[in-house]
């Protein structure tokens, strides 16, 4: 789907569904609380609701994020959020998931938990003074100018 279905129902605490790409849905979820590597009950509940939500399962990929507007705004944002905030060994879920002959699968949407987790490092923020000093080094006539 290229737009959010009118009949899409989300569990309590999940909101603001946004289309990232055709077939890819970003949904804001509640703040992540599970420790690194542990299953998150919130995500399990999301997938259980997905078992009965036909509208959700029209999306092959659903990502649960902290800010769905930011995630869906550009492809770069989507790639950054999903692949820096998820661990394939711990943050991949599926609607109506199963294991058959040691192979995991799901009959509904593949769901990736790409929220900021308690064990993640805090976000980097620019220091204006450091930025100013680096800009001066790269300015015309500066020691780094010939490389830029």
Residue ranges and their predicted role:
Residues 1-148:
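Charged, compositionally biased interaction regions
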């Amino acid at each position: 789907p290229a737009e959010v279905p009118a009949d899409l129902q989300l569990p309590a605490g999940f909101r603001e569904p946004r289309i990232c790409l055709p077939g890819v849905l970003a949904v804001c979820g509640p703040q992540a609380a599970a420790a690194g590597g542990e299953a998150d009950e919130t995500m399990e509940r999301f997938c259980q609701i997905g078992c009965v939500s036909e509208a959700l399962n029209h999306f092959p990929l659903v990502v649960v994020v902290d800010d769905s507007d930011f995630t869906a705004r550009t492809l770069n944002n989507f790639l950054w959020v999903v692949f820096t905030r998820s661990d394939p060994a711990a943050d991949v879920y599926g609607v109506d998931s199963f294991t058959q002959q040691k192979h995991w699968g799901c009959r509904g949407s593949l769901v990736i938990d790409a929220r900021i987790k308690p064990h993640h490092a805090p976000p980097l923020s620019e220091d204006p003074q450091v930025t100013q000093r680096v800009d001066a080094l790269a300015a015309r006539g500066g020691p780094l100018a010939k490389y830029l």
